[in-house]
């Protein structure tokens, strides 16, 4: 009796490359997690390229993260048209041609996502009306899903000679290259969330009432460079004197001045020793002291009993106040650098000093109470005794009243 065809041993079905594939996936995931920190700063370069001529219309570099490095890009329409544009006679070779280009509206169609019927590169992805997503035209083309918006700059159409300053330097208003058709490219919300791992392409067409609208195409590319190894986070190298906090200075009463002895030469007072630079501990304690003073001035009722803690998480040290009894609030906050404070100030010496201050506060509280109220606080059993005696007296009084009422009736 023959066995089924799929009854081979299990070891023959195991892929020998399986462990290596799993290891490669884990390594790749670890690398991606290491380099995909949203706070890492890169050198980001955006480049606008005329695909008809291969020339760069704009190249802008800046430092930023992958979520905020989206600047406005400024370039000229003639950088996309070139010296000669198709067979329509439009060109940017002469001042007159550049000035004429300012009189036309334009519209832009995306090539990275081409809707049905919008054509290909030959049509500039604008094969029919409705494919345009942005531009500067009387019908105001727009889109809610495209990655960019492209509009004219703030130069009015009826101003500017469009003369090249390198050729006609004596003409007022001449610009480098005769550029007088400024464009502004902005990233939309969809563009800031999109993936820019590969270039994105758009088609641009000048609108003419009659004839064929001339076509050009441009691409937008992002290049990301690592600015170098990350600097480890640690103590500020500028702050010198990483010293522990100094002990509080004991205040001494000034001694009365003594007259100099007779015949003694007058002594020139020496210069005072320079004050010691505060250490790191003093700086941190000053932060807590400042937080206490601000809290005591703004909300004095909240400084009756509170804990002020140094939160060591970047980017700042913060004062945290917790109201309540003198329980272990610091463990709930998971802090190791907390100071108890009340209206008398911060306690920074030791827990013994803290207990002493709490004892003084308790004595002050008890001294403000009457003897009867204080007896209840000092003797817990006294409350139970009084309650028991009062209960028995009330029962006896009720029995006596019931007995008198029975005899009377």
Curated annotation (Swiss-Prot):
It is found in: Host endoplasmic reticulum membrane; Host cell membrane; Virion membrane. It is a single-pass type I membrane protein. Residues 33-384 are virion surface. The chain crosses the membrane at residues 385-405. Keywords: Disulfide bond, Fusion of virus membrane with host cell membrane, Fusion of virus membrane with host membrane, Glycoprotein, Host cell membrane, Host endoplasmic reticulum, Host membrane, Host-virus interaction, Membrane, Oncogene, Signal, Transmembrane, Transmembrane helix, Viral attachment to host cell, Viral envelope protein, Viral penetration into host cytoplasm, Virion, Virus entry into host cell. It comes from Friend spleen focus-forming virus (isolate 502) (FSFFV). Residues 1-32 form the signal peptide. Compared to other gammaretroviruses which possess 2 envelope proteins (gp70 and p15E), gp55 corresponds to a gp70-p15E fusion protein with a deletion of a portion of p15E. It is encoded by the defective env gene of the virus. The Friend murine leukemia virus complex induces a rapid and fatal erythroleukemia in adult mice. It is the replication-defective spleen focus-forming virus (SFFV) contained in this complex that causes foci of proliferating erythroid cells in spleens of infected mice. The second component is a replication competent Friend murine leukemia virus (F-MuLV) that serves as a helper virus for SFFV. GO terms for biological process: fusion of virus membrane with host plasma membrane; symbiont entry into host cell; virion attachment to host cell. Residues 406-409 are intravirion. The lineage of its organism: Viruses, Riboviria, Pararnavirae, Artverviricota, Revtraviricetes. GO terms for cellular component: host cell endoplasmic reticulum membrane; host cell plasma membrane; membrane; viral envelope; virion membrane. This is Glycoprotein 55. Homooligomer. Forms heterooligomers with mouse EPOR, probably via their respective transmembrane domains. Forms covalent heterodimers with mouse MST1R isoform sf-Stk, probably via disulfide bonds. This envelope-like membrane glycoprotein is responsible for ligand-independent activation of the erythropoietin receptor EPOR leading to the abnormally rapid proliferation of erythroid precursor cells. In the first stage of Friend disease, constitutive activation of EPOR by gp55 causes uncontrolled, polyclonal proliferation of infected erythroblasts, leading to polycythemia (massive increase in the number of mature red cells). Host susceptibility to SSFV-induced erythroblastosis depends on the expression of the truncated isoform of MST1R receptor tyrosine kinase (MST1R isoform sf-Stk). Residues 254-280 are annotated as: Disordered. Glycans are attached at residues 43, 58, 296, 328. PANTHER family: BC035947 PROTEIN-RELATED, VIRAL ENVELOPE PROTEIN.
């Amino acid at each position: 009796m023959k066995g089924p065809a799929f009854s081979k041993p299990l070891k023959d079905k195991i892929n020998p490359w399986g462990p290596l594939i799993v290891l490669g996936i884990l390594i790749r995931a670890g690398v991606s997690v290491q380099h995909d920190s949203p706070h890492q700063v890169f050198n980001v370069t955006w480049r606008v390229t005329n695909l008809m001529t291969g020339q760069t219309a704009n190249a802008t570099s800046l430092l930023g993260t992958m979520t905020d490095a989206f600047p406005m890009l400024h370039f000229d329409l003639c950088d996309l048209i070139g010296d000669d544009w198709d067979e329509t006679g439009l060109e940017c070779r002469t001042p007159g041609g550049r000035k004429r280009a300012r009189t036309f509206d334009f519209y832009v169609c995306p090539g990275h996502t081409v809707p049905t019927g919008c054509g290909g590169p030959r049509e500039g992805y604008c094969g029919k009306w409705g494919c345009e997503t942005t531009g500067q035209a009387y019908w105001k083309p727009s889109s809610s899903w495209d990655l960019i918006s492209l509009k004219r700059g703030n130069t009015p159409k009826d101003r500017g000679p469009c003369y090249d300053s390198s050729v006609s330097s004596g003409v007022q208003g001449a610009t480098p290259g005769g550029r007088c058709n400024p464009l502004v490219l902005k990233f939309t919300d969809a563009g800031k969330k999109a993936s820019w791992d590969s270039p994105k392409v758009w088609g641009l067409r000048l609108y003419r009432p009659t004839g064929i609208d001339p076509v050009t195409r441009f691409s937008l590319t992002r290049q990301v460079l690592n600015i170098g190894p990350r600097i480890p986070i640690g103590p500020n190298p500028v702050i010198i004197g990483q010293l522990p906090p100094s002990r509080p200075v004991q205040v001494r009463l000034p001694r009365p001045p003594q007259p100099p002895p007779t015949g003694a030469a007058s002594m020139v007072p020496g210069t005072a020793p320079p004050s010691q630079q505060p250490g790191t501990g003093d700086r941190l304690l000053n932060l807590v002291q400042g937080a206490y003073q601000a809290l005591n001035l703004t909300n004095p009722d909240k400084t009756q009993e509170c804990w002020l803690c140094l939160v060591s998480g970047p980017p700042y040290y913060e004062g945290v106040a917790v109201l309540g009894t003198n329980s272990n609030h610091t463990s709930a906050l998971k802090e190791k650098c907390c100071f108890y404070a009340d209206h008398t100030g911060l306690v920074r010496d030791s827990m013994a000093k803290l207990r002493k201050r709490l004892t003084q506060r308790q004595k002050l509280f008890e001294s403000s109470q009457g003897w009867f109220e204080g007896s209840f606080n000092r003797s817990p059993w006294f409350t139970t005794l009084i309650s028991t005696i009062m209960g028995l007296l009330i029962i006896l009084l009720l029995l006596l009243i019931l007995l008198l009422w029975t005899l009377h009736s």
